[in-house]
Amino acid sequence: MRKIKLLLKQHVGAPCAAIVKPGDKVEKGTLVATPTGLGANIFSSVYGTVEEVTDQAIVIQPDDEQPDKYIPIKKSDSKLEMVKEAGIVGMGGAGFPTGVKLGADLQGGYILVNAAECEPGLKHNIMQLEQQAEKTVRGVEYCMEMSNAKKAIFAIKRKNAKAISAIKKAIADKPDISIHLLPDIYPMGEERAVVRECLGILLEPTQLPSAAHANVVNCETVLRVAEAIEDQKPCIYKNISVVGKVHGGPEAQVFMDMPVGISVEDMLDKVGGIDGEYGEIIMGGAFTGLPTELDAPTTKTTGAIIVTIPFLDLHGAKVGLLVCACGGGEARMRDIAQKYNAEVVSVTFCKQAIEVKPGAPRKCENPGNCPGQIAKVLEMKRAGAEYLIIGNCSDCSNTVVTCGTLKMGLKVIHQTDHVMRTIHHPLYRHLTISKTVDQDLSEF
């Protein structure tokens, strides 16, 4: 294993402050950085020696021997304090400190467990539920207790039968915990989509789930809560899917409990390395992930590493970019256009993508439900675009293709195409799946 690099900002809020110095010996569970504001403790994920400390990161040279033993966090009568002490953050999204989220009084409301595994091709959340459903459910109960929630709902796609069966068995004697089945449509894991699907409440783009007396918590986060309370384990591990053009094959290979801060290259070594020429390496999912480098460190929020096939060469073709809140921002879309060797002649935004505040990422007005994009497509055609590069959800992609390709003769490329072709997944074009899901669980 190469050097471990622990970024001091891998959560929502302010960067943490390092409390170690070069030359210090550390173990798994050694506290190495503490919050300076909104944030979460950071612990060493390996046995080793601190090599470098900067304003951005702590670099650790791991020992050759890595015992499983870790330094436990302090025991407390307060479960919430143990969650805060463990440094847990949201492990499926932006990394909001879990101790802060669970401290909100839901007044008898809901914990919504996000098990959608929203990004295509990833499997680490589902594998966790298949293998550790009972402990995950105990984590849900702890979250309910800390948040004063009376009910909990697992939001999971109907296609994941084995995981659904495992959850169903684990909650058989728990009437306050239920399962809501989701369609296999992107972005069903967006937190406002989870609230809408589970509770029938459409929040405004500026509203948090707490407005519906709910907290949306990623299923891995829930498991780490159980580990903190039952095992006094600090947040030092992350479950990661490695996907794409690697020697192990394009299907997702899941690695549980990888040390936070392990490099992308070390993770790729675990699958035999990159298989020949490639387009880019993405940290995160096909929709919301960003290009990364081999020496980049993983964090508490890293869910996937994807290696793609090379990009097609558009030979300078004129393209319009349709930026959506569901996918990459304008900078990411321009990056993709450049990698396709295309000339950007127009940039517009999905009509559902609401600007909440200047400079902040846009929010979808109603995630996964599209009212039509004809005006946006026409705008790009008038600007001279021959191709459209889009980052839309399943439903919006369907409407763009219908009006752009069939009615206006434009060629459509989805920002995820190079990933989907790599993993042999259907391209995002036409919506062929119903958005309504039968909630009958008798077959599971």
Residue ranges and their predicted role:
Residues 118-120, 186-189, 353-354, 419-422:
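Short gly/pro/ser/thr-enriched loop/turn and capping motifs at secondary-structure boundaries
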Residues 89-109, 123-126:
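Conserved alpha/beta core surface patches that mediate binding of polyanionic ligands
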Residues 111-125, 248, 354-359:
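Gly-rich Lys/Arg/Thr-decorated short loops/hinges at beta-loop-alpha junctions or inter-strand turns
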Residues 1-90, 100, 108, 144-159, ...:
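Iron-sulfur (Fe-S) cluster-binding modules
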Residues 112-114, 216, 389:
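Structural motif
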Residues 130-146:
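Histidine-anchored nucleotide/phosphate-binding helix
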Residues 159-264, 270-276, 285, 296:
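Hydrophobic alpha-helical positions that pack around
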